[in-house]
Structures are given as structure tokens and as C-alpha cells.
């Protein structure tokens, strides 16, 4: 069949399948699967571009990491005035009930505060205290928030909290962790910890030893180096990997490390924390200790200037994410954060043993999403997350900076941006109404942004203060915007249907409905997800199914 005839045949086939979907979703699923991947490549081909695919205004300035929602928490100034949303009432924009506007008052009441909303710091520390298990959530007796669920969550986050340096919130340079020394002669563990480097360790002393011994590994080309590094990265635990050139635009303008102080815990042990937990639990209010600030000087803190960035993705569990906003969904996020540090550390050791400098990083040091876009791993979605072709937004990103010159990958476009314009499911599913309902992304101006957003780049507006306020109310991270995303599927043919739908006018209005016809996602409305019993049923399914659903 000629290419033109083949294209027309496949277009007609997919249109026919879509029309039949209204009558019989299950029949269509079987009919579409053999055709859809081929059709998608013709109707909506995947393309590569040599340039960064989104507009960046000449006024753009590098992002200050201490402005993000979680790092701002530890600025004492953020504890002086009530948390502020960019829009006080989004119902005027969306025409729907604003389910997030009362969260600051509800969070204040949870802290025993009456007569005013919670501050930014109070909001975030309320979340952290529940998330660490030091305070019960208000749903602690409900399915999805029980002691069993909380124990799984604690185990999943353990490496991130105990060995990574709590870099999920940001930070840099590198990470530090408090560890309790042990007397090897008596096996006694000290009550007072000492601060040591965490897994995001920038100690490159081994590199000079390798070079001085003449043992630096020489690659035949940048292309060979990239091939080898990608293979090693996958073996060491990454699910997806790409190479980005070092682009200073994405390096934070300020690095910061939370200041830890000793807090005496009820068990008699001293724990180093960036807020006064005993004071809070005794009703004395919320107190944070600020930041140590660092200029982003690579040579001073890591010993080198980066040339390349190895960006990798770790999949999150599909069944666990379906339970959002339960604690089970937090557990798979925590597992990925813990694994990010482990995998990044192993990649760094691999590079150092070859004689190349490396700086392993999680959310710290630089903005991960644009680097992942440059590395060809996906597109930026309406929800502000990287949408990959394989996992959608159901993943976490980490990176390793290096002075090894690698052949970079190119940004790829496979229909995400176009689909996000039409879909808006993540915005509808957000309990805090933190995600923009505007159809098109735009180059945000300062007046379009809340304090944690960086203006002068093309994207959809996100209000992290709203998002964080729901996390505090929920007592656990929320992944609704990931769970309902049409790209969050384990059968990738659905992704191809989404690509096609954006290109055929007859299908565009139905773009977000394909996966709903096929029974995915559950309710989009955040209240209905809980009140219908959907989340509770997904939690029961999670515990009752011994095997995880894999891509």
C-alpha cells in the first residue's frame, strides 16, 4: 500500500474506531490496539528539535532555589504573615467551586490557631510533621491512612530522610545527614549525632588519584561515551536516561542548606532537625532555623565545571499512584526519592572510577524538568511535571553533572503539549485548584506568578501555595494530577490514541475521554474520588494484589 493510501486508510480506521467507542468501549479497545501505534506515527509523528522547545524570554533570570514552596518554609520571614494564594477564589475563573480557598484556615485550626489563616511556614511544617509520622493525620483511621499504610510510607521514604539529606525539598551543594556514631568496642550508640555527607556526595577526591595514576578511561568519541554511560545508568537502576548539555540557565542562582539544630526527643535521643519539633508538639508554636546560603560555585564545591548532565527517570508504581491522595501513593513517591539518591550515587562512583568528576543531585542544585526536556526524556505538561512517553508523569527525575563530554540527546515532541491544551483533567482533579485551567501555556510575566514561580518562561501557571496547603490538610503528598493523567497508563497504545486525538479535529473534543471510556483513572472530581469509595477500593486492591502492574 502506498504511503498516501496507507495514511488515509489508517486515519479512517482510527476515526471509525473512535466513533464506535461510544457504543462499545471494550470492543474498540481490541480493535484499536493493532492499528493505533502505526496510525500515531503517521498522523502525529514524534519529532526532534535541536533547540529548547519552549519560549524563554530575554528577561529570564535563574531561579532562586530558596523560593520554592518547601525551601521557603525554613525562612523565618515566611512565618510572619498568612500564606497567600495567587488567586483568592479561582471559581471566578473556572466557574466551578473553589475547593482550595479555605485550606489556610483549616490548617490553622489543625494547629490550634483561631482567628487567622496559617502562615506559609506553619502550613508546610504541619505537612512535614505528619509526613514524618510525628503527628497523626486527621484521616488516620481511614483506609489509605492507617498505621499499616503509614508504616509502608515510612519505609519507602527512609533512605531519602536518613541517608540522602532531605534533598527532596531542594538544597545544595551536595547533602549532609546526621548519623549516630557507634563505639565498635562496646556497640553503644551515641545519643548525639554528627553531620556527615549524604548520598548526594560531591567528594571527588578519587578522581585525582585515578588521573595521577594515568588510569583515566579514554573514550573514542562523545557518542561512544554517551552509549556507555547510558548503558551503565540503566544497569545501576534508572528506567529512562538521556544526556543534556550543561545549560547554566537551569542552575539555581542560590544554593541553600537547611540549618539543623539539636532537638531532644521523648526517647532521650537528640535529633537534628530544621525545625523545633518538640516545641511544636507541646503547643509552643512553629519555629524554623533558616538556611546556610551558598553561591553556585562548581569549582569551589565540586572541583570542576560541568560539561554534561546525565538525567534519569525512575518509574513510580502504577497501582500505588491510583490510590492518590492516600498515603500509599506517597509511598511510591518516597521509594523513588530514596532510589534517586542511591542510583545517582552509584552513577557518580562509576564516573569517578573512570577518572571523571561527578556531582549527583536530586531536586537540588538545578531545575530538573527543563534538563530532562533537553535530554529528550519527555515534554513539560500542564501540571508542571515532565510527561514521558512511557510513564507519563508517573516518575521522579534525578541527575548527575560531570566534566565528561557526552553527546547530548535532542528534545522530543510527541503530542503532550497539544493534548494538555485540550484535556485539563489534572486541573479538574486538583483538590486545591492549584493548576491553571487556561487553554494555552504562555510566557508568564511577574504579575502572573505566585512567589515560587519563575517568570519569563512558557508554561501553565501553578500555585504551589495551594498545592502545599492541601498536602498539609491531607497529611500526605497528593498525586491526583499524576493518577488521572491520560499519559499515566501501563498500556502505551493509549498514549498513541492521545497523540492522534490532538491532530484530528473530529476527535479533539473527545481527547481526554478515551481512557475514561476504557475504564481507567476513576473519578476526576477530587471529592468524588474519596466519597465514592474509589480510593479505598484501590487501596484494598493494592494490598490484595501481590504482583505490581508493570509497563
From Swiss-Prot:
Residues annotated to bind [4Fe-4S] cluster 1: 420, 423, 426, 485
InterPro entries linked: 4Fe4S_Fe-S-bd, 4Fe4S_Fe_S_CS, RDH, TAT_signal, TAT_signal_bac_arc
Cofactor names: [4Fe-4S] cluster; corrinoid
Source organism, top-level taxon: Bacteria
Domain called 4Fe-4S ferredoxin-type: residue spans: 411-440, 478-496
Induction: Coexpressed with pceB.
EC number(s) recorded for this UniProt protein: 1.21.99.5
Keywords of this entry: 4Fe-4S, Cell membrane, Iron, Iron-sulfur, Membrane, Metal-binding, Oxidoreductase, Repeat, Signal
Membrane topology: Peripheral membrane protein
Any GO MF annotation of the entry: metal ion binding
Binding note for cofactor: Binds 2 [4Fe-4S] clusters.
PTM section of the record: Predicted to be exported by the Tat system. The position of the signal peptide cleavage has not been experimentally proven.
The protein's enzyme class: oxidoreductase
GO cellular component: plasma membrane
Family of this protein: Belongs to the PceA family.
Stated role: Catalyzes the reductive dechlorination of tetrachloroethene (PCE) to trichloroethene (TCE) and of trichloroethene to cis-1,2-dichloroethene (DCE).
Annotated NCBIfam families: RDH (TIGR02486), TAT_signal_seq (TIGR01409)
Name recorded for this polypeptide: Tetrachloroethene reductive dehalogenase
Species per Swiss-Prot/TrEMBL record: Desulfitobacterium hafniense (Desulfitobacterium frappieri)
Gene name of this polypeptide: pceA
Amino acid at each position: 500500500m502506498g504511503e498516501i493510501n496507507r495514511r488515509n486508510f489508517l486515519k479512517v480506521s482510527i476515526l471509525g474506531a473512535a466513533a464506535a467507542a461510544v457504543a462499545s468501549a471494550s470492543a474498540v479497545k481490541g480493535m484499536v490496539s493493532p492499528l493505533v501505534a502505526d496510525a500515531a506515527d503517521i498522523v502525529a509523528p514524534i519529532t526532534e528539535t535541536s533547540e529548547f522547545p519552549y519560549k524563554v524570554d530575554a528577561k529570564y533570570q535563574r531561579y532562586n532555589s530558596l523560593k520554592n514552596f518547601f525551601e521557603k518554609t525554613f525562612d523565618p520571614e515566611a512565618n510572619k504573615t498568612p500564606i497567600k494564594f495567587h488567586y483568592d477564589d479561582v471559581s471566578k475563573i473556572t466557574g466551578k467551586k473553589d475547593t482550595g480557598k479555605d485550606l489556610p484556615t483549616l490548617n490553622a485550626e489543625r494547629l490550634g490557631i483561631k482567628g487567622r489563616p496559617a502562615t506559609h511556614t506553619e502550613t508546610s511544617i504541619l505537612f512535614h510533621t505528619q509526613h514524618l509520622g510525628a503527628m497523626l493525620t486527621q484521616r488516620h483511621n481511614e483506609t489509605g491512612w492507617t498505621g499499616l499504610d503509614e508504616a509502608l510510607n515510612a519505609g519507602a521514604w527512609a533512605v531519602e530522610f536518613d541517608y540522602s539529606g532531605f534533598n527532596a525539598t531542594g538544597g545544595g551543594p551536595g547533602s549532609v545527614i546526621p548519623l549516630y556514631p557507634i563505639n565498635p568496642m562496646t556497640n553503644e550508640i551515641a545519643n548525639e549525632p554528627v553531620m556527615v555527607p549524604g548520598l548526594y556526595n560531591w567528594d571527588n577526591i578519587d578522581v585525582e588519584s585515578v588521573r595521577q595514576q594515568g588510569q583515566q578511561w579514554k573514550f573514542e568519541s562523545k557518542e561512544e561515551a554517551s552509549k556507555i554511560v547510558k548503558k551503565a545508568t540503566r544497569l545501576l537502576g534508572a528506567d529512562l536516561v538521556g544526556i543534556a548539555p550543561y545549560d547554566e540557565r537551569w542552575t539555581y542562582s542560590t544554593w541553600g542548606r537547611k540549618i539543623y539544630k539539636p532537638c531532644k526527643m521523648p526517647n532521650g535521643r537528640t535529633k537534628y532537625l530544621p525545625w523545633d519539633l518538640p516545641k511544636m508538639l507541646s503547643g509552643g508554636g512553629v519555629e524554623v532555623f533558616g538556611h546556610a546560603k551558598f553561591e553556585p560555585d562548581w569549582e569551589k564545591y565540586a572541583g570542576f565545571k560541568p560539561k554534561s548532565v546525565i538525567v534519569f527517570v525512575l518509574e513510580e508504581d502504577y497501582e500505588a499512584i491510583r490510590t492518590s491522595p492516600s498515603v500509599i501513593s506517597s509511598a511510591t513517591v518516597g521509594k523513588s526519592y530514596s532510589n534517586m539518591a542511591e542510583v545517582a550515587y552509584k552513577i557518580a562512583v562509576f564516573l569517578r572510577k573512570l577518572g571523571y568528576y561527578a556531582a549527583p543531585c536530586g531536586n537540588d542544585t538545578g531545575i530538573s524538568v527543563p534538563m530532562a526536556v533537553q535530554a529528550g526524556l519527555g515534554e513539560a505538561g500542564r501540571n508542571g511535571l515532565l510527561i514521558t512517553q512511557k510513564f507519563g508523569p508517573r516518575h521522579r527525575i534525578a541527575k548527575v553533572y560531570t566534566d565528561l563530554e557526552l553527546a547530548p540527546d535532542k528534545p522530543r515532541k510527541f503530542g503532550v503539549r497539544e493534548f494538555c491544551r485540550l484535556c485539563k483533567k489534572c486541573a479538574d482533579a486538583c483538590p486545591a485548584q492549584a493548576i491553571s485551567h487556561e487553554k494555552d501555556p504562555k510566557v508568564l510575566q511577574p504579575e502572573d506568578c505566585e512567589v515560587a514561580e519563575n517568570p519569563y518562561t512558557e508554561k501553565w501557571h501553578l500555585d504551589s501555595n495551594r498545592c502545599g496547603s492541601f498536602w498539609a490538610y491531607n497529611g500526605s503528598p497528593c498525586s491526583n494530577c499524576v493518577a488521572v493523567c491520560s499519559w499515566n497508563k501501563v498500556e502505551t497504545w493509549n498514549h498513541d490514541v492521545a497523540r492522534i486525538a490532538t491532530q484530528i479535529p473530529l476527535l479533539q473534543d473527545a481527547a481526554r475521554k478515551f481512557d475514561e471510556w476504557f475504564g481507567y483513572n476513576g473519578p476526576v472530581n477530587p471529592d468524588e474520588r474519596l466519597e465514592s469509595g474509589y480510593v479505598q477500593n484501590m487501596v484494598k486492591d493494592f494490598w490484595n494484589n501481590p504482583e505490581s502492574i508493570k509497563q
